[in-house]
Amino acid sequence: MTDMFENSEELSVLKSKINKPIDNLETFPAPKNVTVVKFFTDELTSICPITGQPDFGELTIEYEPNKLCLESKSLKLYLWTFREEGHFCEALASKITQKIFDTLKPKWVRVTNEQSKRGGIETTAIGYIEE
Protein backbone atom coordinates (compact mmCIF):
# COMPACT_ATOMS: atom_id res chain seq x y z
CA MET A 1 0.00 0.00 0.00
CA THR A 2 1.29 3.44 -0.88
CA ASP A 3 0.47 7.02 0.05
CA MET A 4 1.66 8.34 -3.31
CA PHE A 5 -0.36 11.29 -4.53
CA GLU A 6 -1.70 10.42 -7.97
CA ASN A 7 -1.46 13.97 -9.33
CA SER A 8 1.99 14.76 -7.96
CA GLU A 9 2.77 16.89 -11.03
CA GLU A 10 0.55 19.51 -9.40
CA LEU A 11 3.07 19.86 -6.55
CA SER A 12 5.58 21.88 -8.52
CA VAL A 13 7.35 23.39 -5.51
CA LEU A 14 7.94 20.05 -3.79
CA LYS A 15 9.49 18.58 -6.94
CA SER A 16 11.65 21.64 -7.66
CA LYS A 17 14.98 22.89 -6.45
CA ILE A 18 13.53 26.28 -5.57
CA ASN A 19 15.63 27.99 -2.93
CA LYS A 20 14.02 31.40 -2.73
CA PRO A 21 10.87 32.83 -1.14
CA ILE A 22 7.54 32.19 -2.88
CA ASP A 23 4.11 33.71 -2.38
CA ASN A 24 1.96 30.70 -3.21
CA LEU A 25 1.00 27.71 -1.09
CA GLU A 26 0.54 24.28 -2.63
CA THR A 27 -2.07 21.77 -1.50
CA PHE A 28 -2.98 18.13 -1.87
CA PRO A 29 -6.19 16.20 -1.14
CA ALA A 30 -6.78 15.62 2.57
CA PRO A 31 -6.53 11.96 3.58
CA LYS A 32 -9.52 10.41 5.30
CA ASN A 33 -9.58 10.40 9.10
CA VAL A 34 -7.10 13.25 9.60
CA THR A 35 -8.78 15.61 12.03
CA VAL A 36 -6.01 18.14 12.77
CA VAL A 37 -2.77 19.07 11.03
CA LYS A 38 -0.10 20.98 12.96
CA PHE A 39 3.08 22.68 11.74
CA PHE A 40 5.72 24.24 13.99
CA THR A 41 8.84 26.26 13.27
CA ASP A 42 11.21 28.13 15.53
CA GLU A 43 12.76 29.90 12.54
CA LEU A 44 10.21 32.60 11.72
CA THR A 45 11.92 35.90 10.99
CA SER A 46 10.65 39.29 9.92
CA ILE A 47 11.65 42.92 10.25
CA CYS A 48 10.28 45.41 12.78
CA PRO A 49 8.35 47.92 10.64
CA ILE A 50 9.51 50.82 12.82
CA THR A 51 13.15 50.13 13.71
CA GLY A 52 14.14 47.85 10.84
CA GLN A 53 15.62 45.43 13.38
CA PRO A 54 15.12 41.69 12.84
CA ASP A 55 12.39 39.92 14.80
CA PHE A 56 12.61 36.22 15.55
CA GLY A 57 9.90 33.88 16.69
CA GLU A 58 8.13 30.58 16.80
CA LEU A 59 5.10 29.86 14.66
CA THR A 60 2.49 27.15 15.18
CA ILE A 61 -0.13 26.50 12.52
CA GLU A 62 -3.05 24.20 13.25
CA TYR A 63 -6.06 23.47 11.07
CA GLU A 64 -8.84 20.99 10.55
CA PRO A 65 -8.79 19.92 6.90
CA ASN A 66 -11.90 20.14 4.84
CA LYS A 67 -10.81 18.88 1.42
CA LEU A 68 -7.19 20.03 1.21
CA CYS A 69 -3.93 19.80 3.16
CA LEU A 70 -0.98 22.17 3.01
CA GLU A 71 2.27 20.98 1.44
CA SER A 72 5.12 21.76 3.86
CA LYS A 73 7.90 22.82 1.46
CA SER A 74 5.71 25.50 -0.09
CA LEU A 75 4.82 26.64 3.45
CA LYS A 76 8.51 26.92 4.38
CA LEU A 77 9.27 28.98 1.28
CA TYR A 78 6.16 31.14 1.84
CA LEU A 79 7.27 31.92 5.41
CA TRP A 80 10.67 32.88 4.02
CA THR A 81 9.03 35.88 2.29
CA PHE A 82 8.66 37.62 5.64
CA ARG A 83 12.42 37.77 6.32
CA GLU A 84 12.73 41.05 4.45
CA GLU A 85 9.28 42.47 5.20
CA GLY A 86 8.23 44.75 8.03
CA HIS A 87 5.38 43.36 10.13
CA PHE A 88 4.17 43.68 13.69
CA CYS A 89 3.68 40.30 15.39
CA GLU A 90 -0.10 40.69 15.35
CA ALA A 91 -0.27 41.67 11.67
CA LEU A 92 1.92 38.74 10.71
CA ALA A 93 -0.31 36.26 12.58
CA SER A 94 -3.34 37.75 10.85
CA LYS A 95 -1.78 37.67 7.38
CA ILE A 96 -0.64 34.05 7.63
CA THR A 97 -3.99 32.95 9.08
CA GLN A 98 -5.90 34.59 6.23
CA LYS A 99 -3.57 33.17 3.55
CA ILE A 100 -3.96 29.62 4.86
CA PHE A 101 -7.73 29.98 5.23
CA ASP A 102 -8.09 31.39 1.70
CA THR A 103 -5.90 28.63 0.25
CA LEU A 104 -7.27 25.58 2.07
CA LYS A 105 -10.82 26.54 3.04
CA PRO A 106 -10.39 24.42 6.20
CA LYS A 107 -13.05 23.97 8.85
CA TRP A 108 -10.88 26.21 11.03
CA VAL A 109 -7.31 27.47 11.22
CA ARG A 110 -5.32 28.84 14.15
CA VAL A 111 -1.92 30.52 13.81
CA THR A 112 0.12 31.31 16.92
CA ASN A 113 3.04 33.70 16.43
CA GLU A 114 5.32 33.87 19.48
CA GLN A 115 7.81 36.65 18.92
CA SER A 116 11.05 36.54 20.89
CA LYS A 117 11.66 39.18 23.54
CA ARG A 118 12.38 42.72 22.43
CA GLY A 119 12.86 45.31 25.11
CA GLY A 120 12.15 42.63 27.71
CA ILE A 121 8.66 41.90 26.33
CA GLU A 122 7.62 38.72 24.55
CA THR A 123 4.60 39.07 22.27
CA THR A 124 2.20 36.29 21.27
CA ALA A 125 -0.52 36.85 18.68
CA ILE A 126 -3.11 34.24 17.76
CA GLY A 127 -5.06 34.38 14.52
CA TYR A 128 -8.18 32.23 14.17
CA ILE A 129 -10.78 31.77 11.43
CA GLU A 130 -13.47 29.15 11.08
CA GLU A 131 -15.95 28.53 8.30
Question: For each predicted feature, which ranges?
Answer:
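N-terminal intrinsically disordered, cationic/polar leader segments
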Residues: M1-E131
